[in-house]
From Swiss-Prot:
This is Foldase protein PrsA. Residues 144-236 form the PpiC domain. Its EC number is 5.2.1.8. It comes from Lactococcus lactis subsp. cremoris (strain SK11). GO terms for molecular function: peptidyl-prolyl cis-trans isomerase activity. Pfam families: Rotamase. It catalyses: [protein]-peptidylproline (omega=180) = [protein]-peptidylproline (omega=0). It is an enzyme of class 5 (isomerase). This protein is essential for production of active forms of the serine proteinase located in or secreted from the cell envelope. A lipid is attached at residue 24 (S-diacylglycerol cysteine).
């Protein structure tokens, strides 16, 4: 089961060049960037042209957001946390990892920076927005505890049906996962994954089928998902428990839901920018953060 990409692209390289060139404007000499038979391109002319690019303001905004988040909460996100997430994607995509980066507009370093931005944003969310008792009670109504399953993802329905027949004949699920699953991220550990009902990286049909199973049971018919067909076996389906004992899990589920809400996260980022006193000095780029400033005034 492949994770769905949910990352905000940080195009910082051009923004970095923009700021570096901006700094050069304070120098008395206008350095030459390039020459041609009819003349030359100076830093000032290049900087002026660069500012006309429709994506420049977006890139500058992304760069400032990252720096503001990192200054405010950088100590809360370790290098190990980022590297572990990076390695998880690298393992998931295997030999296709570089293609994955290219398709999403990343270099290896910018991908790590994007991952770090996501973690920093989550820290900011928890620092700036607290979960109320009424919100916990609302979450409790639909709450389901984390479950652990084994799964086998196949590219076609016939293979999934054969897996189910093999299980009925007594074959081991973990061995079948290794030989028949096309999910390279889980096939070698028996197809085992743990998740909660609010997990948005998994197909709804997958979660619905899994939560109907009791411990030890497996799906009797293939489950259609985006990437193919699934056979699912329930390993651990705990009881829901009580509201009081589940508060920690409920809080985590509310934050997970909020982190996927773009309007909430925009408000959080706008507050971070306000708290960090972010100001753009160049009048041609001054409105790059206007959408966040407007949100900050209504928070």
């Amino acid at each position: 089961m492949k994770k769905k990409m949910r990352l905000k692209v940080l195009l910082a390289s051009t923004a970095t060049a923009l700021l570096l060139l901006s700094g050069c404007q304070s120098n008395q000499t206008d350095q030459t960037v390039a020459t041609y038979s009819g003349g030359k391109v100076t830093e000032s002319s290049f900087y002026k042209e660069l500012k006309q690019s429709p994506t420049t303001k977006t890139m500058l905004a992304n760069m400032l957001i990252y720096r503001a988040l990192n200054h405010a909460y950088g100590k809360s996100v370790s290098t190990k946390t980022v590297n572990d997430a990076y390695d998880s994607y690298k393992q998931q995509y295997g030999e296709n990892f570089d293609a994955f980066l290219s398709q999403n507009g990343f270099s290896r370093s910018s991908f790590k920076e994007s991952l770090r931005t996501n973690f920093l944003s989550e820290v900011a969310l928890k620092k700036l927005k607290k979960v109320s008792e009424s919100q916990l009670k609302a979450a409790w109504k639909t709450y389901q505890p984390k479950v652990t399953v084994q799964h086998i993802l196949t590219s076609d329905e016939d293979t999934a049906k054969q897996v189910i027949s093999d299980l009925a004949a007594g074959k081991d699920f973990a061995m079948l996962a290794k030989t028949d699953s096309i999910d390279t991220a889980t096939k070698d550990n028996g197809g085992k994954i743990s998740f909660e009902l609010n997990n948005k990286t998994l197909d709804a049909t997958f979660k619905d089928a899994a939560y109907k199973l009791k411990n030890g049971d497996y799906t009797q018919t293939p489950v259609k998902v985006t990437d193919g067909y699934e056979v699912i076996k329930m390993i651990n389906h705990p009881a829901k428990g009580t509201f009081t004992s589940s508060k920690k899990a409920l809080t985590a589920s509310v934050y997970a839901k909020w982190s996927r809400d773009s309007s909430i996260m925009q408000r959080v980022i706008s507050q971070v920018l306000k708290n960090q006193h972010v100001t753009i000095k160049d009048k041609d780029l001054a409105d790059a953060l206007d959408s966040y400033k407007k949100l900050a005034t209504t928070n």
